[in-house]
Amino acid sequence: SGALKTVAVSLTKIANDLRLLGSGPRAGLAEIMLPELQKGSSIMPGKVNPVIPEVVTQVSAQVIGNDAAITVGGLQGHFELNVFIPMMARNLLGSIGLLAAASRLFAEKCVDGIEPNRETLERYAELTLSAATALNPYIGYDRACEIVNEAAASGRSLREVARDAGIDEETLDAALDYRKMARPHGS
């Protein structure tokens, strides 16, 4: 039962991360698009509710509750007898069934249909200041610091500020290749 609880906690973490990554479209992170499985919110037309991640978190809560009941059942044993074994078995088997069904549903109706929100991801990549580290080998630390400070103060991208500072486009393309940063060994 403890191992099932660990699975439930892990699934909750994954489901909550997907809910946050899919939040939006304008006020959330909006890094991914979750499959639209039903009409959106009655108060917010166009919103995609993360129904499958929400189901997974509810199932996980039940499995965690079942684990607590099993634990209490285990406390009730006296010598070789424990009249709580039927309840413990029911909750254990119930948790197995719930997790199996929720995992299958999660994979088929949510995870398999996730799409990256490329426009948002590219905008985030262009606006991140942490990419200034990639400029160091090309223009040096001090100059990279000047560029990142100006980008932070002005709200502009590193590329824009660096271009205005006279760094050529070829150098910027080489330094600020986000796909290469994400997969430095080409994998």
Task: Please report, for each region that a protein language model flagged, where it lies by residue.
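Catalytic-core signal marking the mid-to-C-terminal active-site face
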Residues: 16, 23-187
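Helix-rich catalytic cores of soluble enzyme domains
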Residues: 1-17, 89
